[in-house]
Amino acid sequence: MPNPLYRQHIISISDLSREQLECLLQTALKLKAHPRGDLLEGKLIGSCFFEPSTRTRLSFETAVQCLGGKVIGFSDGANTSAKKGETLADTARIISGYTDAIIQRHPKDGAARVAAEFSRVPVINAGDGTNQHPSQTLLDLVTIYETQGRLDKLKIAMAGDLKYGRTVHSLCQALKRWGCEFAFVSPPSLAMPDYITEELDEAGCRYRILGSLEEAAEWADILYMTRVQRERFDEQEFAKIQGKFNLEASMLARAKPNLRVLHPLPRVDEIHPDVDATPHAYYFEQATNGVYARMAILSLVLNEEV
């Protein structure tokens, strides 16, 4: 079967068909079961992080090296010519002349699409502001499939910062293709954006608003927790919402046996450490799946056949 992702930019989940998502999912599972160290042999990847990152940057760079490739780049935009006023378009033009693909994280919404417009090589969005985070979505799909055995018609609860959390936006856009049902738990000021709920309506996916994490845990197959992103608020606003939706082990007492709690990490206090010892906790395994998901993205974008 032809590779539907060869030489493609990976900018937004909404750009990808269900066929492309399934290809990415199955490739990630295959590479997890049977790793290969030759798929990026002779390839040089630009890792361009204008915003702080631990898991995303390190798992992408791990993926490149596990596949036999090499990485150049930076982990702080303050140490680049962007500090001197160089435009993102010019940066993309320059780095695409050095590399076979660019992995980019940027604090500005839409930055990945700008880079893709001016790059001569594929651009992989590692997060652009509050907008999209497609590689996180793929590792979430891998984890959900791994724990539930399917993606079709699952019950997905999302809690915390649903307004600014790019991970939940991308995940809704992906899982609507499998007819999932959603529940949202958040302060009103951090509710899921209208454009996402409108997309769910158009796809015929049901969703509900729940008032507590206990309700969500009892209802869901997956409880996807998010961090209230302090860096996106001033101190006064943050104080009003901090600690409103924090998960503790006691809240999982009526959860179904198959419930898994996921989190894109880092966590602060929204998941108490006592949850870690429950059979429902799966966020550390989820983070590990980031390597395989990103191996799949890089392999498919840079090889005609995998």
UniProtKB/Swiss-Prot annotation:
Residues where carbamoyl phosphate binds: 55-56, 105, 133, 136, 265-266
Record-linked Gene3D superfamilies: Aspartate/ornithine carbamoyltransferase (3.40.50.1370)
GO terms, biological process: 'de novo' pyrimidine nucleobase biosynthetic process; 'de novo' UMP biosynthetic process; amino acid metabolic process
Catalytic activity: carbamoyl phosphate + L-aspartate = N-carbamoyl-L-aspartate + phosphate + H(+)
EC number(s) reported in the record: 2.1.3.2
GO molecular function terms noted in the UniProt entry: amino acid binding; aspartate carbamoyltransferase activity
Cellular component, GO annotation: cytosol
Function: Catalyzes the condensation of carbamoyl phosphate and aspartate to form carbamoyl aspartate and inorganic phosphate, the committed step in the de novo pyrimidine nucleotide biosynthesis pathway.
HAMAP family to which the protein is assigned, alphabetical: Asp_carb_tr
Name of the protein in question: Aspartate carbamoyltransferase catalytic subunit
Organism: Neisseria meningitidis serogroup C (strain 053442)
Source organism phylogeny: Bacteria, Pseudomonadati, Pseudomonadota, Betaproteobacteria, Neisseriales
Gene name, Swiss-Prot/TrEMBL: pyrB
